[in-house]
Amino acid sequence: MIAVVFAQQGPVIPNFGRGDECIRNNGRFCLHWFLDNFGDRFWPRVVEHIELTAIALAIGFVISFAAALIAYRYTRFELPFANLSALFYTVPSIAFFQIMVPITGIGWTSIEIALVSYTLLILFRNTLTGLQEVPDEAKEAAEGMGLTRAQSLVRVELPLAVPAIIAGVRVATVTTISLATIAAFITPLGLGAPIFSAIQTGANTAFVAASLLAIALALIADVVIVVVQRALTPWVRARSRAA
């Protein structure tokens, strides 16, 4: 009896809402679907992307900072490290990731080695340049105050080099965020995973959403670094106001 009633009324089509209708039509960007699926589909990828970027930047900064200090003290060390890091930087990203797979396997290790390698040249150059551009007057004043070479480095030279160092961190951060997206070509991690998946399936919303999230992540990171820079270098603002 119930079957007869439903047959007379015609087929029953569930109401999926505007988001699902947009997805069925493969709209360019379905906002409702994105908001409904952000927590499950995209937020874990955002966290992975942040982790990939943060780990690479932390390791790259430690290596580059130490190398810059050595090169600042022993100038003959500058050229070999600069050439090595420049060699890493010139390797195409996808090729670098593929080269690492037979060596360290598919996963975080291969991606992090490649990402760290791309940060070295930028961070090393900016740190060393910042130290080399410290005015001689500042060094002489520190020496006149009785500071040792190590004390002068920590209290005078490094603080004056902070703007150049952070400028390098800004560039390295944005670069790493973009390269971490390409890393999903090797293994599905970060925001590159939904991007490459959407390319294969033709899912417009997933592609646009993941791309916009990667762009937003880079912009937010850049703003945060600028705020940190201003907090660490108040004398730069005071100097610009005086000028």
What do these predicted regions represent?
Residues 39-51, 82-88, 101, 105, ...:
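Alpha-helical membrane-interface segments at transmembrane helix boundaries
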Residues 8-56:
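Periplasmic/extracellular loop-to-transmembrane helix junction in inner-membrane transport proteins
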Residues 84-91, 100-103, 113-127, 182, ...:
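Hydrophobic transmembrane alpha-helices
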Residues 75, 132, 209-243:
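C-terminal transmembrane helix and the adjacent membrane-cytosol boundary/short C-terminal tail
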Residues 67-100, 125-132:
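Cytoplasmic-entry segments and transmembrane alpha-helices of multi-pass inner-membrane transporters
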Residues 54, 117, 150-182, 205, ...:
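Transmembrane alpha-helices
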Residues 126-165, 171, 195:
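Short cytoplasmic-facing helical segments at TM-TM junctions of multi-pass membrane proteins
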Residues 41-52, 101-122, 206, 210:
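Loop-to-helix entry region at the N-terminal start of transmembrane alpha-helices
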